[in-house]
Swiss-Prot record:
Single Gene Ontology BP annotation: DNA catabolic process
Enzyme class, UniProt record, top EC level: hydrolase
Lineage start: Bacteria, Bacillati, Bacillota, Clostridia, Eubacteriales
Family membership noted in the UniProt record: Belongs to the XseB family.
Reactions performed catalytically: Exonucleolytic cleavage in either 5'- to 3'- or 3'- to 5'-direction to yield nucleoside 5'-phosphates
Name of this protein: Exodeoxyribonuclease 7 small subunit
Coiled coil: none
UniProt EC number: 3.1.11.6
Molecular function (Gene Ontology), one example: exodeoxyribonuclease VII activity
């Protein structure tokens, strides 16, 4: 995947595009493997964003206020890839 930075929403949209492309087109093996690798990277990134959001929600539900934790998502969907 390119070195450009993506928000969660951008990464998810690209992941959906990659999946459609792999499902609906006949690609050469090398190109299909490249897309598959990009999809795996995007999937891991999106999963990480969701896990961090879940941590924030759990903290808010437990304490009623948000506390800083190392590595936590700091601002909504501003996390970038």
């Amino acid at each position: 995947m390119k070195a450009e930075k993506k928000t969660f929403e951008e990464a998810l949209a690209r992941l959906e595009q990659v999946v459609r492309e792999l499902e609906l087109t006949q690609l050469p093996l090398d190109q299909a493997l490249e897309l598959f690798a990009e999809g795996i990277t995007l999937s891991k990134y999106c999963n990480s964003c969701l896990e961090q959001a879940e941590q924030k929600i759990s903290m808010l539900m437990a304490d009623g206020e948000l506390k800083d934790i190392p590595g936590a998502l700091s601002g909504g969907s501003s996390r970038e890839l």
